Amino acid sequence: MFHHISVMLNETIDYLNVKENGVYIDCTLGGAGHALYLLNQLNDDGRLIAIDQDQTAIDNAKKVLKEHLHKVTFVHSNFRELTQILKDLNIEKVDGIYYDLGVSSPQLDIPERGFSYHHDATLDMRMDQTQELTAYEIVNNWSYEALVKIFYRYGEEKFSKQIARRIEAHREQQPITTTLELVDIIKEGIPAKARRKGGHPAKRVFQALRIAVNDELSAFEDSIEQAIELVKVDGRISVITFHSLEDRLCKQVFQEYEKGPEVPRGLPVIPEAYTPKLKRINRKPITATEEDLDDNNRARSAKLRVAEILK
């Protein structure tokens, strides 16, 4: 069963100022909670383009959204293909785009997918089951230096070197094939005192592997840059992030487009080319309410940022 509790559901969609006949893009369909809430506000002239790289999510969403299928176009693709997706649908601009980043609960809860450090499964972690690169490939075949780099950069793991050394030693004996096998090796690389602090000891390495397998950060950066060009004037973009790397990236991109290019000195009137592309609706990210946290513990790290397109 594909059960998923959407985080900050109302806020994400309400900040889009939904027009009942508008065209919107859900870049991360997942359990379809946000999609359902949005579709309930669209009339029969409105349209939602629902993207997910996980075919299982799309198959499930068709059941969840069964009353609204005439208003939805499902696209099995990576959201970094936004421009091409709209081109294929003969759509030039849309009224709003939203992202709910991170792994959906079902992907974490289905052991076979290999995302969870609580269940034993093969080392997979692919959001798109048709792609070739898996966590098994990275753990067993990438160099010590490459492992250190991704654990540190994507997981902010301070014991990256020690963990990579333990992985190297184990895989010389035999391949590391399962999630719990990897968890035990990670624990060996972290001093006992540090293991007792900061949540599950494997959390940061598993996050790093997931980001590397799915190329998440560069895919998001590619996508958000395209989104800014694809939303109409006065349209909005909502982004929910779940870790500091994504949040920082989102904040930096929004800031860059809000600032606009450097204006040459002495101009009597500022040409439109030098005016900002967007404005941030919230300077500080919106965080989950107590109610959200009661429903879903994963909401604790969620942050929502919203921008409005100005030109």
From Swiss-Prot:
It is found in: Cytoplasm. Its EC number is 2.1.1.199. GO terms for biological process: rRNA base methylation. Pfam families: Methyltransf_5 (PF01795). Keywords: Cytoplasm, Methyltransferase, rRNA processing, S-adenosyl-L-methionine, Transferase. S-adenosyl-L-methionine binds at residues 32-34, 52, 79, 100, 107. The keyword Cell membrane does not apply. One of its GO terms (molecular function) is rRNA (cytosine-N4-)-methyltransferase activity. It catalyses: cytidine(1402) in 16S rRNA + S-adenosyl-L-methionine = N(4)-methylcytidine(1402) in 16S rRNA + S-adenosyl-L-homocysteine + H(+). Gene3D superfamilies: Putative methyltransferase TM0872, insert domain (1.10.150.170), Vaccinia Virus protein VP39 (3.40.50.150). NCBIfam families: 16S rRNA (cytosine(1402)-N(4))-methyltransferase RsmH. This is Ribosomal RNA small subunit methyltransferase H. It comes from Staphylococcus aureus (strain bovine RF122 / ET3-1). The gene is rsmH.
